[in-house]
A protein has these predicted regions:
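Phosphopantetheine-dependent thiolation modules in NRPS/PKS and related acyl-activating systems
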Residues: 1-37, 41-83
Length: 83
C-alpha cells in the first residue's frame, strides 16, 4: 500500500470522512481545509498512525507544518518509517 493510500485510510477512519477520503490528494489541506480536522483529530490520527505502523511520535515532532496537507503528513510518515 502506498503511503498516501494508508494516510487516506487513517484520515477516513479517524475523521469519519467516508467516500470523501478518496478525493484527498497530496495537495489537500488538512488544517483549515477539513472542518473535521481539529486538535482532537490530530490526536486520533497520530494514535492510529502509531498503531498501524508501529511508530512512536513524540510531542515535539508535531507541528502545524506536519498537518498542513495530506502530502506533508505523508512525508512525515515516510520519514518515521525510514528512521
Amino acid at each position: 500500500m502506498e503511503t498516501i493510500d494508508a494516510v487516506r485510510s487513517v484520515l477516513r477512519d479517524a475523521l469519519h470522512l467516508g467516500e470523501r477520503a478518496a478525493r484527498l490528494d497530496a495537495d489537500s489541506r488538512l488544517m483549515g481545509g477539513l472542518p473535521e480536522f481539529d486538535s482532537m483529530a490530530v490526536v486520533s490520527v497520530v494514535t492510529m498512525l502509531e498503531d498501524q505502523f508501529g511508530i512512536t511520535v513524540a510531542d515535539d515532532e508535531l507541528s502545524a507544518e506536519v498537518f498542513e496537507t495530506v502530502g506533508s503528513l505523508c512525508r512525515f510518515l515516510e520519514g518515521k518509517l525510514d528512521a
